[in-house]
């Protein structure tokens, strides 16, 4: 009885001591952690709120240079024409003429293409383009009287509305000038002699061939899609060496034998 009683007491002691050991918390160094104070949570909350306040206070200062930079970038932005196309405008009227812009402000057409007929068409806005002579460095313009001329500065008179016709030709009408009563647009046109016509003329209509221009732009050379493969040439095997045979001395041909004919009679 005494042994069994002692065994039961020992087991009960082990069972009671196990929960007490589990409640102890150990730090990474193996030492028991100090008890947590309820006031520490409030202290940590105070520190976090102070940190958030300092960061929020410093954020407007950091953001202000960025806002100033964006404003300076917006103010320094300059408009630049886009969609540049370099080529010539061919009018199908008469024998056919290329639109030319002269340095002195004259505008007409020439049957043969020249440096004066090299034009640069660039987009200003949706459907609105400008036309500049590459050689003369002047812009095609239409005055309030409908006369075509070249302008050194790009103004509203230099803006034209580009439209694509069903016959693959284009028409160019002034973006600001038109007939006030009827609202008819004024078009860029050439007559049969290659001279510029007034846009306000009642005969200048989008259906007439004098207003039809075919853009002839220089297409960029497309890269070749094919490629060549160089195969190393196979060297022919050397011919087998043949021993040189000594040439036999030439034999002299024997002298011809002469036969005498003998005639026997009777």
From Swiss-Prot:
Compartments it resides in: Secreted
Span of the signal peptide: 1-17
Keywords tagged on the record: Glycoprotein, Growth factor, Mitogen, Secreted, Signal
Protein's UniProt name: Fibroblast growth factor 5
Annotated transmembrane regions: none
Gene that this sequence comes from: Fgf5
GO cellular component: cytoplasm; extracellular space
UniProt feature, compositional bias: Low complexity: 38-72, 244-256
Lineage summary: Eukaryota, Metazoa, Chordata, Craniata, Vertebrata
Source organism of the structure: Rattus norvegicus (Rat)
Subunit organization: Interacts with FGFR1 and FGFR2. Affinity between fibroblast growth factors (FGFs) and their receptors is increased by heparan sulfate glycosaminoglycans that function as coreceptors.
Positions of region (Disordered): 23-81, 228-256
GO molecular function: fibroblast growth factor receptor binding; growth factor activity; nerve growth factor receptor binding
A Gene Ontology BP annotation from the UniProt entry: positive regulation of MAPK cascade
Function: Plays an important role in the regulation of cell proliferation and cell differentiation. Required for normal regulation of the hair growth cycle. Functions as an inhibitor of hair elongation by promoting progression from anagen, the growth phase of the hair follicle, into catagen the apoptosis-induced regression phase.
PANTHER family per UniProt: FIBROBLAST GROWTH FACTOR
Cited Pfam families: FGF
Protein family per UniProt: Belongs to the heparin-binding growth factors family.
């Amino acid at each position: 009885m005494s042994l069994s009683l002692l065994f039961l007491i020992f087991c009960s002691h082990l069972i009671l001591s196990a929960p007490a050991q589990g409640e102890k918390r150990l730090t990474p160094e193996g030492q028991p952690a100090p008890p947590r104070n309820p006031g520490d949570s409030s202290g940590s909350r105070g520190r976090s709120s102070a940190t958030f306040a300092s960061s929020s206070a410093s954020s407007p200062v950091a953001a202000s240079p960025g806002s100033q930079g964006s404003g300076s970038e917006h103010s320094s932005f300059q408009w630049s024409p886009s969609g540049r196309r370099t080529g010539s405008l061919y009018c199908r009227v008469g024998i056919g003429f290329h639109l030319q812009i002269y340095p002195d402000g004259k505008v007409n057409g020439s049957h043969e293409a020249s440096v004066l007929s090299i034009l640069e068409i660039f987009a200003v806005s949706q459907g609105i383009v400008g036309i500049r002579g590459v050689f003369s460095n002047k812009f095609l313009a239409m005055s309030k009287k409908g006369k075509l001329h070249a302008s050194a500065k790009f103004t509203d008179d230099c803006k034209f509305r580009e439209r694509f016709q069903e016959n693959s030709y284009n028409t160019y009408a002034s973006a600001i000038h038109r007939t006030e009563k009827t609202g008819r647009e004024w078009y860029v046109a050439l007559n049969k002699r290659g001279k510029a016509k007034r846009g306000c003329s009642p005969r200048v209509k989008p259906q007439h061939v004098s207003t039809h221009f075919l853009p002839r732009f220089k297409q960029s050379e497309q890269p070749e899609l094919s490629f060549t493969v160089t195969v190393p040439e196979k060297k022919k095997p050397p011919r087998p060496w043949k021993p040189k045979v000594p040439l036999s001395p030439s034999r002299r041909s024997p002298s011809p034998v002469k036969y005498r004919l003998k005639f026997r009679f009777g």
